[in-house]
Amino acid sequence: MAETARTAPAVDFVGGAVGYRFRSQAGRSHALLKATGLSPTRSLHVIDATAGLGRDAFLLASMGATVTLIERVPEVHALLAEALEAARAESDELAAIIGRMTLLHGDARVLLPTLQADVITIDPMHPPRTKTALVKQEMRLLRDLVGADPDVGELLAAALSADCGRVVLKWPLRAAAPPAARKPSHQIAGKTVRYDVYVRPRTT
């Protein structure tokens, strides 16, 4: 019998690329850590406003951050919840990391005004690529499930109005900024994406 094609992305914090990066500690120099300001001597509370597959949130939590994940798509939220529990049961080390992760279901534009954090990260569905190879299967399946994020400008505005000291937007390296986005404080560039960093005074 032919194998049925998957219609949902795999969310896995134990095996695959996430597990390898964790076991090999390959993420210690990741640009996201620089963008958020996280370091071994500086623990932060980070809100991941677009949790998706949870990979960035897990990386941050594995490096000591306390992370609140917000996911508005019910199917993706359910996949994340299941993966978090599977990782929690895998080992004490993973359980300690998962213990620093809190998953919320809802629209970040609504939830952010009710929350406080040191950093808010935003990694929306990026504009479709037109001159590159097909995106990896997991991201393609995620895009098929959640669709586009036309409201990224509204989400960025909500984050910049929230009680936090820094907002980090992950965006394609050479893509134009989202509509109405103001100039970031600085940028950290990777090979295919950049992190637009907005450093701002706390409201309290």
From Swiss-Prot:
Compartments reported by the entry? Cytoplasm
Q: Can the keyword Kinase be found in this entry's annotation?
A: no
Keyword line: Cytoplasm, Methyltransferase, rRNA processing, S-adenosyl-L-methionine, Transferase
Chain positions recorded as S-adenosyl-L-methionine binding sites: 55-56, 71-72, 123
A single Gene Ontology CC term: cytoplasm
Identify the Pfam families for this entry. SAM_MT
> What domain of life is recorded for the organism?
Bacteria
Q: What is its EC number?
A: 2.1.1.242
Q: What is the enzyme's class at the highest EC level?
A: transferase
Gene Ontology molecular function: rRNA (guanine-N2-)-methyltransferase activity
Reaction(s) catalysed by this chain's protein? guanosine(1516) in 16S rRNA + S-adenosyl-L-methionine = N(2)-methylguanosine(1516) in 16S rRNA + S-adenosyl-L-homocysteine + H(+)
Q: What family name appears in the similarity comment?
A: Belongs to the methyltransferase superfamily. RsmJ family.
Q: Which PANTHER family match?
A: RIBOSOMAL RNA SMALL SUBUNIT METHYLTRANSFERASE J (PTHR36112:SF1)
Give the function comment from the record: Specifically methylates the guanosine in position 1516 of 16S rRNA.
Quote the protein name from its UniProt record.
Ribosomal RNA small subunit methyltransferase J
Annotated source species: Rhodopseudomonas palustris (strain ATCC BAA-98 / CGA009)
